[in-house]
Design a protein with these regions (language model features):
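Short, intrinsically disordered, charge-balanced linker/junction segments flanking boundaries
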Residues: 119-125
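N-terminal/domain-start alpha-helical segments
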Residues: 1-119
């Protein structure tokens, strides 16, 4: 089963997202802090990561994941929508970037695409 590590400190976002991922057939491990997420990053197939966390900034979490040599896809989920925020997020190690508010169907499609790419099942043009 594919495991989503959901890192979001706002229960109004994390709880419905966790349910949606569960309905899609994913195992979900949810954390509201960066430190908690870093303790559980091993074994995750994708990380859905908020930037504004109470302890460690999501950018730092992404950098630490990459510093460990992990290639787990990271999808940043944030209210920050400036072009510079997108660039900084991708440079920190994110594979994709979704701004809040988001459309659930699009977010789920992006997660599926990242999981496919990571597992080598992406269809080549």
């Amino acid at each position: 089963m594919t495991t989503v590590l959901l890192v979001e400190d706002d229960p109004a976002i994390s709880e419905p997202l966790a349910r949606a991922f569960g309905r899609e057939g994913y195992e979900v491990r949810a954390h509201g802090t960066g430190k908690g997420a870093l303790e559980e990053v091993a074994g995750a197939d994708i990380i859905v990561l908020d930037l504004g966390l109470p302890d460690i900034d999501g950018l730092d979490v992404a950098r630490q994941v990459r510093a460990q040599g992990l290639t787990t896809p990271i999808l940043m989920l944030t209210a920050r929508s400036e072009d510079t925020d997108l660039v900084v997020g991708l440079d920190a190690g994110a594979d994709d970037y979704v701004t809040k508010p988001f459309r659930l169907a699009e977010l789920l499609a992006r997660v599926r695409a990242q999981v496919r790419r990571a597992s080598g099942e992406a269809i080549e043009d």
